[in-house]
Amino acid sequence: MSETMKAAIFVEPGKMTVEEVPKAALQQDDDIVIRMVRTCVCGSDLWFFRGLSGQAAHSQVGHEAIGVVEETGAAVESVKPGDFVVVPFPYSCGKGPVCKAGFESVCPHGGYFSACQAEYLRVPEADGTVVKVPGSPEDYSDEQLASLLTGSDVMST
């Protein structure tokens, strides 16, 4: 298995590249790694591309995705390898009072993705973050997959 993957890289305003980068890997027991099925360009991605907001030069981008679970950390209970999932742009623990009140996007244990436009993605706090989708990607048309992707909190452009 390759130790690298292809990923979209923001170079500077107006310039993106696709580069080989280290493959996403588990770092914590509550992580999963997914193989990307679809990702998209969000309206906020266009802000830094146009130079209207900050984004570190030579950094991975993207924060909406659907994919298939490739690997799970030892503490993950909600999904298993082979499961099809939607990955929202904020990740969260799903267990604390903030998350239970419905405010996952401000979870004190959470954060935001900026690496979904790649072949693989590490998802921290997986049990509180991903949403399992019935079946597998092959069960859906391209139009249905595009619709599922909007479930990841896409901001219209």
What positions do the PLM features span?
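Residue-level recognition of beta-strand termini and adjacent short loop/turns
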Residues: 12-14, 28
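Short Gly/Pro-enriched turn/cap motifs at secondary-structure boundaries
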Residues: 11, 23-24, 56-62, 109-114, ...
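Short glycine/threonine/proline-enriched tight-turn/helix- or strand-capping micro-motif at secondary-structure
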Residues: 15-22
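NAD(P)H dinucleotide-binding glycine-rich loop of Rossmann-like/cofactor-binding domains
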Residues: 93-157
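Glycine-rich beta-strand-centered segment in the early N-terminal region that forms part
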Residues: 22-39, 49-100, 136
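Short structural boundary motif marking the start of a folded domain
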Residues: 2-8
